[in-house]
């Protein structure tokens, strides 16, 4: 028996991990160019379908579920005596939305006009939204027509803009628009630029991971004819977040970030990324960079390295003490990380190989940066003992990651 995902560019998909956590079958990826040839195969029992084939597969089906007919696209196909297509994305989207907000009587704005947008429209209808507005790049109402949709109650991003590896891009900025809830179907990165704006404005929000897991559960029910509890959905969401999200450390130069990060990496399955060490490997001594090219140049390359690594997953990231002085580093770190500020009294801070201490006192640096460490971080730990601090951070991470 064969089950899997049909699509293109699937190496960053979580689908295999989700279906194998469900435990009913092995799951593989089918990156196919020739659909005619694929649908002639006789050894496939069930597939999920993703970009760019959700509409293209319809011509190969013998029948479709009512939801799939309404939406006009398919994400699940069961092969038996006939080939039947389903749309379980709508169930996943309903699950994601209903945990946070009741759409009944609300104005819903949907960004994008592709297959996922069609699913969002039908989901909003199912949940009895009062008004549904679709905004797109080339449609009748465009992203820049803010006055048309500025009073929306709920915003759903159904575009791929901001998805890995093109992180931190967004089709709109919140400001004039202040919905009561926002949903982004993207799940990699964990927080898109849009969702980080929501956090800043204290707007309830969620990414597409729950939608992805729930639609997979519904597909599994179709494949196996077994009923799966919603508790399984939340358990898988937590496992995926715990595995894939990063732990990032910020704090004063010499506060022990590298040591604590090394212990955390050793005690988890996460890979250690020490930003200062990578800079040294690529560009030479940090002391020399400060002395010859100056701090401004150093901050530029530091941000470049942070941007590169913080979009990846399953890491422990030890940042340099001054990483918080560059505003964009906040967004680099928070897209995939829980950020911890670790601290020590000035008397315990190490001065070794800390060029910033040659021109500034510890007190001056602390006065200039403490508010930045506070703004950048999700949690604070006083690093009296590296092993204890590492243990406490891992425990907190495992609790924090579920939301």
Annotate each language-model stretch with its function.
Residues 2-100, 189-191, 195-197, 201-205, ...:
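Phosphate/diphosphate ligand-binding glycine-rich loop within oxidoreductases
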Residues 335-376:
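A glycine- and Lys/Arg-enriched "phosphate-lid" helix/loop adjacent to the NTP-binding pocket
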Residues 141-206, 323-329:
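Rossmann-like adenosine-cofactor binding region
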Residues 185-245:
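Adenosine-phosphate binding glycine-rich loop
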Residues 277-325, 329-334:
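ATP-dependent small-molecule kinase phosphotransfer cores
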Residues 7, 87-90, 97, 101, ...:
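Glycine-rich adenosine-cofactor-binding loop
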Residues 127-143, 276-283:
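NAD(P)-binding Rossmann-fold cofactor-contacting core
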């Amino acid at each position: 028996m064969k089950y899997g995902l049909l699509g293109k560019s699937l190496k960053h998909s979580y689908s295999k991990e989700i279906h194998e956590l469900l435990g009913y079958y092995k799951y593989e990826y089918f990156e196919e160019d020739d659909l005619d040839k694929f649908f002639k195969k006789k050894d496939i029992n069930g597939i999920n379908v993703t970009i760019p084939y959700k509409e293209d597969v319809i011509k190969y089906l013998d029948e479709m579920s009512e939801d799939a007919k309404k939406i006009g696209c398919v994400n699940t196909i069961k092969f038996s005596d006939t080939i039947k297509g389903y749309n379980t994305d709508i169930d996943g989207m309903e699950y994601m939305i209903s945990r946070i907000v009741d759409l009944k009587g609300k104005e819903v704005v949907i960004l994008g006009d592709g297959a996922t947008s069609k699913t969002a429209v039908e989901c909003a209808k199912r949940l009895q939204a009062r008004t549904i507005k679709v905004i797109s790049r080339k449609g009748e109402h465009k992203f820049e027509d803010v006055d048309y949709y500025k009073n929306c109650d709920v915003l759903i991003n159904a575009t791929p803009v901001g998805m890995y590896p093109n992180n931190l891009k967004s089709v709109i900025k919140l400001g004039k628009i202040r919905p009561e809830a926002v949903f982004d179907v993207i799940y990699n990165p964990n927080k898109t630029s849009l969702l980080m704006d929501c956090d800043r404005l204290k707007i309830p929000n969620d990414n597409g991971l729950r939608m992805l897991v729930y639609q997979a559960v519904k597909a599994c029910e179709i494949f196996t004819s077994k009923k799966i509890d919603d508790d399984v959905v939340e358990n898988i969401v937590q496992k995926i977040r715990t595995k894939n999200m990063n732990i990032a450390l910020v704090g004063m130069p010499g506060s022990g970030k590298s040591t604590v990060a090394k212990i955390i990496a050793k005690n988890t399955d996460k890979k250690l990324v020490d930003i200062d060490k990578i800079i040294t490997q690529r560009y030479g001594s940090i002391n020399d960079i400060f002395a010859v090219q100056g701090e401004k140049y150093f901050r530029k390359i530091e941000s470049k390295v942070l941007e590169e690594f913080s979009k990846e997953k399953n890491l422990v990231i030890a940042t340099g003490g001054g990483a918080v002085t560059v505003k964009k580093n906040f967004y680099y770190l928070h897209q995939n990380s829980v950020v911890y500020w670790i601290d020590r009294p000035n008397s315990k801070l190490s001065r070794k190989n800390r060029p910033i201490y040659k021109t500034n006192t510890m007190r001056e640096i602390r006065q200039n940066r403490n508010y930045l460490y506070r703004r950048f971080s999700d949690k604070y730990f006083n690093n009296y003992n590296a092993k204890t601090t590492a243990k406490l951070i891992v425990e907190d991470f495992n609790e924090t990651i579920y939301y």
